[in-house]
Amino acid sequence: MRLSKFFLPVSKEAPADAAIVSHQLMLRTGMIRQNGAGIYSWLPLGYRVLKRIEQIVREEMNRAGAIEMLMPTLQQADLWRESGRYDDYGKEMLRIKDRHERDMLYGPTNEELITDVFRTYVKSYKQLPLNLYHQQWKFRDEVRPRFGVMRGREFLMKDAYSFDLTEEDARAAYRKMFCAYLNAFDRMGLTAIPMRADTGPIGGDLSHEFIILADTGESAVFCDKALLDLPAPGLDLDFESDLTPFVTERTGYYAATEEMHDEAAFNALPEDRRVSARGIEVGHIFFFGTKYSKPMNAVVQGPDGQMVPVQMGSYGIGVSRLLGAIIEACHDENGIVWPESVAPFDVGLINMRPGNEACDAACNTLYAALTAAGREVLYDETDDRAGAKFARMDLIGLPWQTTVGPRGVTEGKVEVKNRKTGEKHDVKIEDMLAQLKGS
């Protein structure tokens, strides 16, 4: 993509009401535009990152055996009355009437809707286990939306729902999602800590939040420092194997949100292993048994011919919120430092002298070669000053910058910069592609 053809409304300053770094940088880099309290338009740069995060989540859900679908944003109020939750959400739920005066709502979550889908089509235990998921926009009418996409009113979430015949099978499904979440966050360059959490209005007796440590986190969290060094399960994990040992190891260390915190247990840790910090919730998983299947009559015929309510779990990831969380974890004084897996472009190609025949030819050759090799390239061929070009590239945080100037071209070289480390190297043009591909 040529920068002159791309829509990138970069600003020198962030609005004064942007209180945290991620909100400031998302506004400055032209990733989002606020349309109302907690409601944003996703501009091209931000949308590219959003789609890359969405794809990582999709790949890890598929790897764990979940099946993608899509449910609507608008739901019938009668389904929520059936489950008994219509009044539980209070003013946080946006209630709507259609032209026929039927009660509708903009879904804050999807347990009722997916249960209705399930009970319509699944009748026998032979159709189990089943895990269905979607990635869809939600709306919760927060009293005080703040921190940009971290606590907006409209947001993109991945919701998965598992259905099993027995509690034992349902807990196995829970463990699969537990491991899939750790893999997904690891691929995004994040260390996510699973913490026992309150189940809230979703309900159930087992729940974990996945927390990213950050100074601007919304709540206090407490954990054993050893958790920060544990590796993710890995992409070669066999999801059909017994995952109990892995989950037991992860949950054997102390980790809790403020609501579940046990001061005595925390203080029993050696002092140098106690981590008391702020955290950002990026995922939340629940096992809630028959909380929804019983009142909504989501039953299947078991092996003995008896009709039994299915055991359910739900698993959420805040896809749009993850952009803010990644920026909070990956930035410096010059701007964003994107992990390669979620960056909007892989390489920023800077032409220092547009109109110079040798520079133009070298840039065109590199642009074509990188693109052919599958690299996403943002090519800055504008007439802006050198300082402005470098500052803009640092601000938007692409993992690699390649600078082509008249002096280097005469020597057959370009400068390659690693945005994360700041290291710069002069590289022969014919060697540059190999270096970038091996990064």
Swiss-Prot record:
Its EC number is 6.1.1.15. Keywords: Aminoacyl-tRNA synthetase, ATP-binding, Cytoplasm, Ligase, Nucleotide-binding, Protein biosynthesis. Its main location: cytoplasm. GO terms for cellular component: cytosol. Belongs to the class-II aminoacyl-tRNA synthetase family. ProS type 2 subfamily. Homodimer. PANTHER family: MITOCHONDRIAL RIBOSOME PROTEIN L39/PROLYL-TRNA LIGASE FAMILY MEMBER, PROLINE--TRNA LIGASE. This is Proline--tRNA ligase.
